[in-house]
């Protein structure tokens, strides 16, 4: 049976690992999308309706047929959602579509939207969507504590967007201060929540968040995640296009970091197994690494990769919620505190459970090709510099960090 990835349908297919190997196999979740004419979001169900006419439903029905031949019981969502999610930066280019996608989740009971301005309109708009979760808006620092009260998952896309000619590192000073301030509030108001960092540069903002949490005495490395899912989504998409494969079958692990050469797709570990020429490996690797710039240039100054980032982040949020809800087979790639290399943080496939990070998939770094091994050694230098930059920023006196 061909393996499948959770990338193509973030809320319908998840990766799991068989006991015999570290190779992921698809697991269908019990989710139903209504057909487009009467779309009402995601619904908990035991089977995809045979009368559903949307193309997505047809795809899911095909997946159900495959799943029914498996000896694994599909994971079922709770009928009554019970998780609170806060999006910090909800009025931004990523925050708005991300909030919409999270609003569709059957696991979310309450969606808190925070920003320094313009968030009331976003909340009003989303509140008209007839999905179960209730939407509340919070504006400005004075309302941030209330936004974070009793939240289970905090998602942070806040920050300035990339512009043509701007690298992720150019964003550092502005976004570093934003992340530092927001994570301080998280530490004070919901220290046990899962924290998802989207704000770039992730290679530095995650270490900043870790240092802030340490200073507050509430750091739990199992609950701090740098969201690198977009790199996996892109790798799966580009490989499926290059090799004319069904996207739902493709799974490419991506390790390292979340900027430039620190993004390393392990094409040799692509599932299903695919043969690449040296030229294809080079072409795909470079395209995946520079995909963000590809979008920035295409938008000609009008924005960055907001929609694909929102999609990827929503997938990661959904995975975290499933883990909190008791699904024991949740795997994603993420930039986390790790002992996989000699670096303190590293992106790789991880297992997520009720209490956060449960395991780092060590097999990701085993059996690498010569090309991948050289790329790994090369990325470590740049990644270490970014991590050190984040740690140094977090430990600056407040006045110096603000400059």
Swiss-Prot record:
Lineage top rank: taxon: Eukaryota
Top EC class for this record: oxidoreductase
PROSITE patterns referenced in this protein's UniProt entry, alphabetically: MDH
CDD domains to which the protein is assigned, alphabetical: MDH_glyoxysomal_mitochondrial (cd01337)
Active site positions: 258
Biological process annotations from GO: chloroplast organization; defense response to bacterium; embryo development ending in seed dormancy; malate metabolic process; protein import into chloroplast stroma; response to cold; tricarboxylic acid cycle
GO cellular component terms attached to this protein's record: apoplast; chloroplast; chloroplast envelope; chloroplast inner membrane; chloroplast stroma; cytosol; mitochondrion; plant-type vacuole
Quaternary structure (record): Homodimer.
Family in the record: Belongs to the LDH/MDH superfamily. MDH type 1 family.
Protein name: Malate dehydrogenase, chloroplastic
Classification lineage: Eukaryota, Viridiplantae, Streptophyta, Embryophyta, Tracheophyta
